[in-house]
Amino acid sequence: NNGLMYLFKQITYALSNQEIESVYNPGQATTMLGMLKYPDDFAKAQGLNQLWTKDTTATAVIAENTGFGVRQAHIIRKPTVKGTFSFIIPLKHIFGFCDDYDKIVYGFKHTLTLVRKTDDDAIFRSNAAGAGKVHIGRISWFMPHVDPAHMAKMQLYKTIETKVKRLMNKNTHVT
């Protein structure tokens, strides 16, 4: 399960070049976290869209491992060109702070750094299957963009300006 995360050895999230969180061995880390936080029926809905289905055995034999069979059927069944796949991984699956962070971030550059790993751990296959290769041709990052109405935007600018001035005054009065 969780095979896509095994394609990377490190994933880092940064705001304006300031590292917020870095996950080493995201395959193992997100698998352990997912086992603790996702209910057993998670794979029947949203989980399968991120290739999350629990294995029932340690083998890649469809007759023995129903989790492996479900993932394989999902990949093959998708209406895409043979040999291609597409999945959605929410940031909260990777980074712990995303689970409960609900603030709007204004004026910062967001950076997601993915360091690729070999395919050895990412491809779960039977002993009879040949070694595969995963080529990542494109990764898309969807970030919600809030564009408030003009009046709300003006109020937000005033609030930000007031807080910046207060912060600057605190810094100048420090002795």
Residue ranges and their predicted role:
Residues 1-175:
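Flexible assembly/topogenesis modules
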